[in-house]
């Protein structure tokens, strides 16, 4: 299928992880009327993508814990997932259930994107047993009744959460990044915050692979260009003075305030 070709090329362009997204339960209701992605992937897609990839890891986002979780997670592992992500959990018990089902058979990442997951953050970190964490800004800002996805970044919430992961030695990331020069909050600002906060992972926004590209070769060129520009900018960040990041925080707050006013 055409989408499988895109996944292979994403790997060749330097994307280190390729997703299969099984999450459907509750997502439509949470994000009703929003211009967000509902992937519609299936368990069969895991096997197809696994066969395509040679160097990139295969990350599968499963559904939040429900009565069919054990069967779903077992099949995801059998089909070759390298990492399984648990989304939209609210309790320590849900995390514990997830980790018990996986039982060390592949890597695990927790997607902190509900108000309750943040309220139980210390307990979840103390429980341990998961490999990494990601902060999902879209559902998180909705959960807190905020207006704009990047409010948790501008108001210091993401920084506080990242500090706890860092102290616990848990690799972490947050949100996603658009192409350099794009986004309501420019990608450069977001990437600089990733660097400042010690984040080591982010999700590429749909602007890298949306429906505007009907010509495959044009998409391939634009995709590689977008990745190269991000990598170049990332390589410059360690050389920049602290004042750059102080000014960047100010810009993040200003740009977010413009959106929410």
Where are these regions (language model features)?
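Active-site-adjacent beta->alpha loops and helix N-cap segments on the catalytic face
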Residues: 27-47, 66-70, 88-106, 117-120, ...
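Short, small-residue-biased leader/transition segments that mark boundaries at the very start
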Residues: 2-6
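Active-site pocket-lining/capping segments in soluble small-molecule metabolic enzymes
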Residues: 19-21, 26-33, 41, 170-261
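Surface-exposed amphipathic alpha-helices with a cationic face
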Residues: 11, 46-54, 77, 96-103, ...
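Conserved beta-strand positions in the central sheet of alpha/beta enzyme cores
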Residues: 18-19, 85, 134, 203
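Catalytic domains of carbohydrate-active enzymes, especially glycoside hydrolases
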Residues: 7-23, 79, 198-200
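Catalytic alpha/beta core domains of metabolic enzymes, predominantly
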Residues: 107-217, 225-226
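Glycine/small-residue-rich loop that forms an oxyanion/phosphate-binding "nest" at active or ligand-binding sites
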Residues: 57-86
């Amino acid at each position: 299928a055409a989408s499988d070709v895109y996944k292979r090329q994403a790997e060749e362009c330097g994307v280190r992880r390729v997703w299969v997204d099984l999450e459907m339960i509750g997502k439509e209701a949470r994000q009703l009327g929003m211009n967000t992605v509902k992937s519609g992937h299936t368990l069969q897609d895991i096997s197809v993508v696994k066969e395509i990839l040679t160097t990139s890891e295969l990350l599968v986002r499963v559904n939040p814990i429900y009565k069919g979780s054990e069967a779903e997670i077992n099949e995801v592992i059998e089909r070759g997932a390298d990492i399984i992500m648990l989304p939209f959990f609210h309790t320590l018990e849900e995390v514990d259930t997830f980790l018990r089902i996986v039982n060390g058979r592949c890597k695990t990442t927790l997607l902190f994107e509900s108000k309750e997951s943040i309220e139980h953050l210390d307990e979840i970190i103390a429980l341990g047993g998961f490999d990494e964490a990601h902060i999902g800004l879209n559902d998180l800002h909705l959960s807190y009744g905020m207006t704009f996805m990047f409010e948790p970044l501008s108001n210091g919430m993401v920084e506080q959460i990242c500090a706890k992961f860092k102290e616990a030695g848990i690799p972490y990331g947050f949100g996603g990044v658009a192409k350099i020069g794009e986004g309501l909050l420019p990608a450069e600002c977001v990437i600089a915050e990733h660097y400042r906060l010690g984040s080591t992972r982010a999700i590429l926004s749909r602007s890298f692979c949306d429906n505007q590209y009907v010509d495959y070769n044009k998409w391939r060129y634009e995709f590689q260009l977008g990745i190269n520009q991000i990598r170049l900018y990332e390589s410059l960040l360690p050389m920049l003075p602290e004042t750059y990041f102080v000014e960047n925080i100010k810009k993040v707050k200003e740009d977010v305030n413009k959106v929410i006013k």
